[in-house]
């Protein structure tokens, strides 16, 4: 397993981690299998989405802010919206590996989704296969 450290600089942001996932795949030597990317935090997640236009991640964050506003929640730490956003994006993704490459679509990238930053974070990449 590969463990990556990440520092986020905003309260909410999507960080493109595709290069780190590709790096883990290269180091693993796996040609055919699956790459699992996992976030061990309850206020951050992992997703796959467009990486060609940075406005897409800005739009996604804007929509998440609209549908999950900062209101009074029972959870008193003040980060309930971050927990709910993580529920929507998820904590992991699985990406097929074919001929030593991530089987991502032409415009796809892997993102670490920060909803309660800035913070020091980690994410894990596990490559399985042959």
Model-derived features: positions:
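Active-site histidine-anchored catalytic micro-motif
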Residues: 1-130
